[in-house]
Amino acid sequence: MSLGPMGMNTGFDINGMVSKIVSAERVPKQQRIDNERTNIDTSISAYGRLRESLDTMKNLMTQFRQEKAFAVRKVDTSNEQVVSATATTEAIAGNYSVDVLQLAQSHKIASEVLDKDAKFGPGKLHISLGDKSFTLDVQGNSKLVDIVRGINGEKSNPGVRASIINDVEGPRLIVASNVSGKDHSVKMSAQAEPGNPLKQLEYKTLEQRVRDLEKARAQAQQLIAPLTPEQQKVAAKVAEKIGDAARLVDQEVAQEIRSAAQSAQGAAGEALNAGELTESAVKAAANAASEAKKYIRPEDRIPGWTETASGTLLDSYWEPEEELDAQGQKKAADVPGWSNTASGTLLDSYVTPQEAQQKLEQKLAQEKAQIEAAIRSGKMTPEEAKAQARAKLSPEERAYIEQVEKAQAALNAAQSAFDGYGGMTEVQSAQDSMVVLDGVATLSSNNNIIENAIEGVNLTLKGKTDRNQPPAEIGIEYDRERVRNDIEQFVAAYNQFFQTSKELAGVDPRTGQAGPLAGDSIVRSADSRLKTVFSSSIEQAPENLKSLTEFGITTTRQGTLEINYAMLDRQLNNNFTKLGEFFGGNQGFAKRVEDAISSMTGVTGSIRTREKSLNEQTYRLDDDQRSLDRRMESLEKRTHAKFSAMQDATSKMQSQLAGMMNALGG
């Protein structure tokens, strides 16, 4: 700052002077707001800690008040690798043995090794899982990966998963069910021309193949010589018995395969080869067919049979001895009016359809030889030869030949499919889980969880019981340990509240500093209400369970709670089922503690009300702060304007004085 004439200042530090004036005005007011805000924030935090410690106790009491809080069961198992269990409150305490015979598993089939460059289609794959099915259209020249994607991406797929395994010899298609259980087996059939690789993706059991063959034979028989209703019934019985025999062979083969797979040494060498299996199936089918005669009704094989005379006839009737040779027996069945007395004449004079057919075939054979010679010499083509041969036949004969050819073609196709089956095979059977409970009850499920195996108990199966080990033991009992821990948590929660309230409302003996809630009546009231509940008697409880002291829970000289574990364990062991009468209900101990705490921490409780009041004070301080800021801003502007005006006036005065000095020659 420079001095002009007569010692007047030529300039002022206006900003510095304004800042000091405003600061002197702001500081005491700002300090009051800040101190009050700090006290409020400290109180809000203290009440929050107090409320949280009380709510912890309240939440524990809410659990105790649940209807089945003391009905929880504890489950132990002797072999967790075989079975585990969970129990609801409905489970009856006791010990049970569980023998796991088999685990549930999903069905899985696999193809033979396929050509890695194979082109499939055109055709269709019909795939079913249990009682649900879908059809996949396979375009011509499709790759194996295209089929896999088609199966897995089909929207109507009920739960079949396809994949490719790259064997050392080539790719294999694996198709498996996503659902376990015997009712969820996979079936696959292919609709394609013979020789199409798509036929390699069919899956048929031996039983199915036998039944298909018998069906084709029956259809062929119908085309050539339709069966009577009675013959159809007998044929159905025969087919059923043959199918049953094939199924038994299927089962024996499957058992052989499983045994071979489980054998430690020589498994491959002991397995049956394909030829032996086919021979076994054929023998079984032949034996079954030989017994089919017994299915013919008595009225069809016993002369003079009636309902009234059936008893006598069945007792006295002897099957007649065969009187004719094989050719005669074969012919006798077709001779109208045949009997033993007239057999010679009838058999000699009657020409059966079979004999007529033989003559026709001989004639056809001669003509066939002539036609073949003409074809070899080039006089006619095979098509012309066939047309010429058929033209010589009557319409009835042509129709008959066409029927025979059609039946023979169908039968050849069925026989070829049976003998040369090259489709998919089963690598894992579909089966339910199965256990034996307590050695008497057999239980099963389509998965490895058996619900309500024992009332209120679910079993989770993990492995089969070792043949050399005893069944797994499952023990179910009341969960006393959990209730004991809950009571310990309640006592710890109260002690935590007590320590927190003492810290917030007391005076630190080392520093002499009072807590943020020192002298607050709410803290004293909270502890007083809880102590009143703790010392009260629960009238609805049994005689020896009416107060906390009978659980061994008492108040120490310092004001905390402590547990006499000998008394607590005695009550848990002797009166476990009666604990709910003390803690539960609308008049029980747990509800009383809840109500006492709710009166403090609830929406209208004393602590909540105080917190609300403090929050409102915070809002008021915010208003005070904004008001102070506005006043200080206004003060700063006014003060700055005054000093600016003073500086202008001073400058003018100095200018005038300087002019006067110059005029006086000074």
From Swiss-Prot:
Coiled-coil region list: 354-419
Signal sequence range: none
One GO-annotated biological process of the protein: cell adhesion
GO cellular component, one term: bacterial-type flagellum filament cap
Keywords: Bacterial flagellum, Coiled coil, Secreted
Superkingdom assignment: Bacteria
Subcellular location: Secreted; Bacterial flagellum
Pfam families for the chain: Flagellin_IN, FliD_C, FliD_N
Listed InterPro entries: Flagellin_hook_IN_motif (IPR010810), FliD (IPR040026), FliD_C (IPR010809), FliD_N (IPR003481)
Quaternary structure (record): Homopentamer.
Function of the protein: Required for the morphogenesis and for the elongation of the flagellar filament by facilitating polymerization of the flagellin monomers at the tip of growing filament. Forms a capping structure, which prevents flagellin subunits (transported through the central channel of the flagellum) from leaking out without polymerization at the distal end.
Family statement: Belongs to the FliD family.
Name under which the protein is recorded: Flagellar hook-associated protein 2
Taxonomic source organism: Vibrio cholerae serotype O1 (strain ATCC 39315 / El Tor Inaba N16961)
